[in-house]
């Protein structure tokens, strides 16, 4: 049946989708429809921006900065929406106020915990900077003394990043509570109230999920991640559910190992720090081994001197014994023979150890020399010292590369932490400002009500 001539055309040619979104015959004006559609389109766009090309990118500080920027934008949008709705606080239901105030105060607590953890990690940069300063050398290669001085700072930094923040652990329960309380509240007799509740449901869902990612990554545990599924009746549901599925699966897989340092930039610095710590510890052990060898050598020399002195005493005793009795001379001779045997065995052992060491060194040089000859086709005498120089050179290059890598990684980590901390602080101020504005309007509304009661 054709439409009657002159009848008004529907704004939606295929029917009004808001009848599905708001069952029960609720009607929205065209202005409210446009406001809600604009808000939810922006929400869906932000969610699509947050979906990384690789799911593991959520473990980076750069993705976390992008996520905080999106949250700040969304919370600014909700404040603008409330203004555009022209819905005074005096018309708000008490339940709406309770929901907003309760969720906002918990969100502020989470922001404080995140800021505290970022500040703690940033303070650890002092230890890294000191270690890098100590390892700096005009010749390029740090000495064993420099490695020894840097080792305690590296160890202390690794202990610092290996500790789980108690505040972040408590955030897990808060996030689960917020996720459990998420629901689209039914609103009667207020089209503006329905739009407001729908918008608040969207922003709370996204905020809780993103914050759970932050807490999970910084704590190195998948437990804080919340399980949410947005119904299809919301225009941004597809973008949210796609992001949730991809990120949750990847984080659960990555964090199941229990590694505390889950942030990629932090892991890069930690890998370099551990390698430098091993090199510094090895250098210290080599120094202690050298000191021990010197002490053993000194002890052997003293034993040899005592043995020689005892031998002289035995000879004197032998002469005296010959002047008295032959029997005493025989006893002393046996003593001399025994002492001489012990001395010979001691010299033999020392000589044997030196010979073994020399044979091993010669064998090693011959083996390396053979390899050099095969590679170069030369029997030059200088080839004999190439293996030793190559080994030393490789160790120096490894050490310098490790220091260079840690310096670059530490600088990237510092900039990343500073930038993320600033963004979290800005987001905190946005949430706090919105909360304060609501409380201020509530006080004004209450005061106006009291004045009206007195006047009447």
From Swiss-Prot:
Keywords: Membrane, Transmembrane, Transmembrane helix. Belongs to the ROH1 family. The keyword Iron-sulfur does not apply. It holds the Pfam family ROH1-like. The chain crosses the membrane at residues 195-217. GO terms for cellular component: membrane. It is a single-pass membrane protein. It is found in: Membrane. Residues 368-390 are annotated as: Disordered. It comes from Oryza sativa subsp. japonica (Rice). This is UPF0496 protein 4. Its main location: membrane. Residues 371-381 have a biased composition (Polar residues).
